[in-house]
Amino acid sequence: MVLAFRSLSRTIKSPSPLLHSKSNFISRVNQSRRIPSLVANMATPARTQPPWKEPKASSAAKLKVWNSLTRTKNDFIPIDPEGKEVKWYSCGPTVYDDAHLGHARNYVTNDILRRILAHYYGYNVKFVQNITDVDDKIILRGRQQHLLAKFKAENPTVTEEVINTTIKAFDAYVKKNLPLLSQDVNIGSFNSDSAEKYANVIQGKSVDGVGPPGDKEAKIKMHLRTAGTAVTSLLAPSKSTPEDVDVFYAGAEDVLLPYLDSLYGSSIDASDHSVFTTLTKKYEARFNEDMRNLNVLEPDVVTRVTEYGNEIVSFVDKIIKNGMAYSTSDGSVYFDIENFEKREGNHYARLEPWNRGDTNLQADGEGALSSVKTSEKRNDSDFALWKSSKPGEPAWDSPWGPGRPGWHIECSVMASAVLGEQMDIHSGGIDLCFPHHDNELAQSEAYWQKEGGAQWVNYFLHMGHLSISGSKMSKSLKNFTTIREALSRGDWNARSLRIIFLLGGWHDGIEITPDMRKSGSSWESYVTNFFYKVRDLEVHPNISSTATEDEKVLKSFESAKEKVHSALADSFDTPTAMRAISGLITDYNSADKVGLSDSVSFDVARYITRMVRIFGLDGTADPYDGGIGWAGIDIPSAAKEHVYAVSRERDEVRQHAIVGDLSDEVLDSIISQHNAAKQQDMEALPYAEVLSTFQENLKALASKKAPAKDFLDLCDQLRDTHLWDLGIYLEDRENAPAMVRPVDAELQAARDQKEAIARQKAEAKLKREQEEAEKKAKLAEQAKINPKDMFRTEEYSAWDEEGLPTKDKDGADVPKGRTKKLKKEWEKQKKLFEEHLKA
C-alpha cells in the first residue's frame, strides 16, 4: 500500500498561526556565514555572490532591506506594478517536537517585520507559511516513538530481558557517540571511565584541550548526559512499582529509541501513515498554540507537504525535462548542478557560494536517512529532489517508483504553487542559508527557467541566531528551553520576549544576558509608567495648563517621529526606533506638566501606542483605533466606579487631615458623595465593600474624635492592604490626586524587596535583643557567685582569706603579674555580687 498525497493546489486559509523554521538544522560553523575567508580551504569554484537583478520601480522606494542575496541593503521594490502587494514565503516548522526559544526568535522576528510592512508602510502582504510534515527527522522520530511505545506495552515491568535489551542499547549508543571509551565499557565503570577519557570536555575545554569548545564538545556533553542517565536507570535498586518502571523508561528512553529503530525500523508498515501523522498533528497543534501565546499573526496561507504530492512530482518531472535533474536506478532523482550552471544566468549557491564545497552542510541538508554515498550521483554535490523509499519509510507513487520528496523541493513547490514564478520576500533562520535556501533557489530557477536566468526571489531575509549566555539553542544538542516551558514558568511573556528581539535587531544574532534582560524590562516599565501618567489625565485633567511647554514637547515629538521613520526605512532598524521612543518619553517626563496641554500629551501617547501596537507589543489591538496604552495598565472595569470613588474620598481626607481641618461637617460632605450600599453585581462587590468599609471606618474615627494621624493611617491602610490585595495601587503624588494603577510585576517586586529588607532588619533586631538578653542572663548568673569562691578551682591549690589564689596546682607561688590580674577580676565580681545581694 502506498501512502497517497492529497492533491491540493488551491491556497489554504490557516485556522491558526504557523511560523516555524526547519528546526533541527542548526549544528554548523556559523562564522562561515559572515566571513567567507574562514572556509577558504574548502574546494569551491566560486567565492563571491552572483549579480542580483534589481526590480523595476514604479515609484520611489519606501525603505531599504538587508538582502542576503547581495549582503547589503537594497531598495525594497515590490513586484506589483502598483507597488501595493507584497508576496512573502516563510520557511515553517518541521513538526516533530516542541518549538524552543531559538524558534521563537525566528517567528516573532518574522512577525515584527511583517507587521511593519503591513501596518506602518501599508503594504498588502500575502504571507505564506509551510508545515513540513514529511521529513527524515519526522520519519525517524515517528518510527522510534512507535517502536518504543510498542516495546513498553509488551514489557510493562522491568524484566531481565528489558535490562539486557537496554544494556545492548547503551553499548550501541556509547560505541557510536563516545568513541574515546573502550568498546567493552560497562555500566558499572561508565561514570569513572567517561570522567577520565572526556575530562577536557567536562572541564569546559575542547576534546584535545587545545582551543575553545564548540558544537562538537556540546554534542559530547549531551551524549555523556544521555548515557549517564541510562546508567542511573540500569543501576537503580528498585524497578518493581509502576512509578519505578516509569522512571526507568524515562531514563533509558534516549538510548532505546535509536537501538529499537536499528532493529525493527525497516519492518514498520510505512503505509500505516498514522505512525507519522500522529506525531506531526500533535506538534503542529502545539506549535500553533505557542505562536498564539507569542502573539504571532496567523499566516494568510498555510501549506503542508502532504497536500502537495502531485505538484511535487510534476515539479520534479519538469526540472528533469529542462535537463537539470536526472533519475537513478533506485528510483531517486538528483539535481544536476553542473548542467544547471551551464545555462546562461544560472548560479548555484547564490546566498553562500563560499560554502558550496562544505560536505558537512551538504550531508545535513540531505537528511539522516540518506545514504552516505550514492554511486550513481554525477557529482557529490548534487542533491536529492526525490528519494526512493527504503523499508520502513513512507512512499508515494511517482514515475520513478515509490519514494518521497527531498527536503528542499518541498518549499520550492509549495511557494511556487501559491505565489507563482517570482516572490518579493523569502525568509527563514540564518542556519538555512546553505544548503536549504540555496538549493531552493537553484531548483526553482531550473523549473521557471528563462532566457538569461530566472530570479525566483528578490529579497532573502535571514533572522539572526538566539543564544542565552553564550549558548546557542539547538534541539540536536538538547540544550533548549521550549516556548511553552519558558512561558509557563514565567521566565518570559509575549511582550517581554518581543521587546528583547526589537532591542536586538532582526538580522544579527542576539545573546540574552542578564544585562539584556534588564534593558528589556526597563524599557517596558518606562513605557508602562508613561501610559499610566497620560491615562490619568483622562480622570484628572490638567485644567490649569498654561501651554508654555507645548512647543518644546511638540518639537521633541516631531524629531522622534523622524528618527523612528528613518530607522524603520533603514532595513527595519528597530533598536534605533526603540531608543527614539524611550527618548521621546524622557523629554516628555522632563517637561513641566503644569505648562503642558492635555491634547499634546494625548497626541504623543497615541503615537507611541500606535508604534508599540505595530511592533506587536499589545496583542491584537488595532494600531489605528486612536487608543492610548497597552494591555495591563487598566484596573478591572467592574472596579472603576468604586475604586475611583474611594480614591477621591481618600485624597480629600488626606488633604484635610494634613492641614488640620477635618471636621465632622467636612467628613459628612466627603462621604455623602458616593453610595457604596446600593446593590452590586458579583464582579463589583469586592470593590464596593472596600469603599463601604473605608466610609464606615471614617465614621468610627470621627465618633471617637480621633487625631489626624489616625485618619492618615487609615488612608495608608486602604492603599497598602485593602486595595493592594485586590491588585490595585494608589500612587500618591505631591500636589496631585493619587494615581490609580494595577499592581504590576515591578510594583510587586519593589514591595517584596521592601518587605525582605524589613524582615532582615526585624530579624537582626530580634537577634540583637536575644543576644543582649542572653548576655544579661549570663551576667545575672555570674553575679550570684561569691568572689571568695570564684577561683576555688583545680587550677590552684592555696588561697588567701579573700579567696585570691596564692599557689598554683603544683604548689608554686602565683606570679605577681598574674595575681594583679586576678585581683582586678575579683574586685569586679565583688561589685557584681554586692549588687546582687542588694537586689
Label the predicted regions.
Residues 43-56, 63, 130, 154-248, ...:
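Active-site neighborhoods of enzyme catalytic cores
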Residues 123-126, 322-329, 726-732:
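Short, well-structured beta-strand/strand-turn elements
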Residues 43-96, 111, 282, 286-294, ...:
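Alpha-helical recognition segments enriched in aromatics with Gly/Pro capping
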Residues 2, 38-43, 95, 113-126, ...:
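N-terminal alpha-helical targeting/anchoring segments
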Residues 179-180, 184-214, 250, 449-451, ...:
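Catalytic adenosine-cofactor/nucleotide-binding cores of aminoacyl-tRNA synthetases and other
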Residues 2-73, 79, 153, 242, ...:
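Basic, alpha-helical terminal appendages of large translation-related enzymes
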Residues 91-93, 262-271, 389-397, 560-564, ...:
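Short glycine/proline-rich turn/loop motifs
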Residues 60-143, 147, 212-230, 248, ...:
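N-terminal catalytic cores of NTP/NDP-binding nucleotidyl/phosphoryl-transfer enzymes
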